[in-house]
Amino acid sequence: MAQRSPQELFHEAAQQGILAQPQPWWKIQLFMWEPVLFGTWDGVFTSCMINIFGVVLFLRTGWLVGNTGVLLGLLLVSFVVLVALITVLSGIGVAEHGGISSGGVYSMISSVLGGQMGGTVGLLYVFGQCVAGAMYITGFAESISDLLGLGDIWAVRGISVAVLLALLGINLAGVKWIIRLQLLLLLLLAVSTLDFVVGSFTHLDPEHGFIGYSPELLQSNILPEYSPGESFFTVFGVFFPAATGVMAGFNMGGDLRDPADSVPLGSLAAVGVSWFLYIIFAFLLGAVCTREALRSDFLIAEKVSLVGFLFLLGLYISSLASCMGGLYGAPRILQCIAQDKVIPALAFLANGKGPNKTPVAAICLTSLVTMAFVLVGQVNVLAPVVTINFMLTYIMVDYSYFALSMAHCGLAPSPEPVPRQGPDTLHCSEHLLQDRAPSYGSDVPARSLSEGTLLEFTKDMDQFLQPIEELESRQLGSREGNNPKNQKRKGKKGAKQTLQDSFLLDPGSPLSFPTRTSERLSVAFCGEQESYQKQQTSRSESHDHLVPDLRNQPRVNREDFFLKCRLQEQEIQRRPSVFYACMCNPWVSLLGALASLLIMFVIQWLYTLASMGVAALVYFYIGQASPGLYLGSASNFSFFQWMKSFLVPSCRSLRSAQEQIILAPSPAKVDMAMTQLTQDNADFATRDRYHHSSFLSREQLMPPY
């Protein structure tokens, strides 16, 4: 019977089948469940779509088209998605070299730029997630208060606090319930989007500005016409949080079965689908509604929908799901920062509960910060704060990939990328249970293979106690030997052979593995094991080799064996060519970082300077509190030195080729003065003069220039 994987979304049924099979006593895990791991579509794609579909899409798309017009609005939406796409590609490029862990953005940046910079950007990203969650909850509370006829600001705040506490309980229940709820919410969002598209050409509502399709209306809405106090960059700052959920897949790397494949595919698919839906929303609203209704009525899309209740349901669900996504990713980043001891004051956040290491303390802390910003109670005030923090994070992700590429291509030899680790991949030089224990934090590559007494104990027990099937086969093979007639024919076994049979050891191989796990070993070791079994079978058939001479057998060098296995594993685990590899360009990442930096100052230069000042303070504080952090794989690359190498030669006056003269180095002019130690004597006149000494001063050795 094939053994089913327990790492599924609904794994209770699979667990029953697995627990029914007998296991050795040293492998039984009491009071412990297997961690729940997810894939590309149920994990990454769902989380990204839930985070991208937020309040901004349902409440501010019409306002965007009313100010910028249809043409410029489509360009603005495409530009926002392009900035997010460049960041996703940069993150994929960094992850291809360093892997993906549960730390997400923090782990990527700290592995490239060092723990000090990674901790700074990670804290800013967590802060931005908290503010974004407050913005989503506030938008949800505004809609509920308008629906109930409550215009008081404290009613909005009360609803927001109640919703935040409910989402806090769901997050504390575990990641399994978060993903299950997200699948249902994504289905309801698809229904509400379809309701909006169908309603745009099935009915009209002229009283609220919904007059239907007409070429004249589309022509009047094609050009921008801003409201008083608004501009292109203010509209951009309000709409940019619509693309802040693209990094949600990177933040859940520790809860994925194969993050190296799931994160790139799921993130790119979510960005493409989101861009298409944004274009549909913006074009349809500009083609069927008047400009006055678009700029004044934030719920104009609800009038366009066929069933207004379904659209409001999608709005409420998107608000809750986006906030829940922020409450999921931010605490795990804080947990990784605490586990790496970047900030000693946050050490109490390192512990987790359950098999998935749910960060309970970090979830409570981020919920308190979100509740503090819920008291602001205005979406347009919170949106620029979210924009600045997320753009700072995106700038650092883009720069990380650029610095990593420059450090590996220009200043240092390019190492081989980390091979993709599948769920069933097991190397012969690793522990047998290494793939069963998921890793959390950004220090996974630095861990030694010898850590963990449980793994060592299990491996030792597997070496000494072989499976039951092999024992039964040996018993069947030895029935003939138990016959008294056959026992007389056989000679007496030697001491070495008796010891080998009693402990079931294999003296010919450096390692001994159980039969059930032999299918997961590398090709090299399997070949050696099969050849050795054939040799043992041939020896048992002959009577002349009952006691093998182990001293004459060549022993396999342990280091050579592991080196051979690693070389063959590199050939087997070589990464296949993927379609998104050609899109990861360091120069595009640098251009995206510079463009994002410029847009930050244009949107809100005051918020930008304040955020940079806070980032500088946190950076220097981490340097003082934890001076021994990892420097990063791109520590030998300096952006200012790189700029200097380009700018300084261009600023100097270039000399012609005829004026460049190359002189060969001339040896130093040193005068040798001989001093005779003894007087001349005729007795030794035939001998050569030996034992002479000379003294050279420092000035004589150094010629004058």
From Swiss-Prot:
GO molecular function, one term: chloride:monoatomic cation symporter activity
Transmembrane segments: 38-58, 69-89, 92-112, 121-141, 159-179, 181-201, 232-252, 268-288, 306-326, 368-388, 390-410, 587-607, 612-632
UniProt organism field: Mus musculus (Mouse)
Pfam families cross-referenced by the UniProt entry: AA_permease (PF00324)
Similarity comment: Belongs to the SLC12A transporter family.
Gene3D superfamilies noted in UniProt: Amino acid/polyamine transporter I (1.20.1740.10)
Major subcellular site: membrane
Cellular component, GO, one term: membrane
Bias type Basic residues, positions: 486-495
Any GO BP: potassium ion transport
Membrane protein topology class: Multi-pass membrane protein
Region (Disordered): 472-512
Keywords: Chloride, Ion transport, Membrane, Potassium, Potassium transport, Symport, Transmembrane, Transmembrane helix, Transport
InterPro entries assigned to the protein according to its UniProt record, in alphabetical order: AA-permease/SLC12A_dom, SLC12A_fam
Coiled-coil intervals: none
Function, as annotated: Cation/chloride cotransporter that may play a role in the control of keratinocyte proliferation.
Gene transcribed to yield this protein: Slc12a8
The protein's name in its UniProt record: Solute carrier family 12 member 8
Compartments, record wording: Membrane
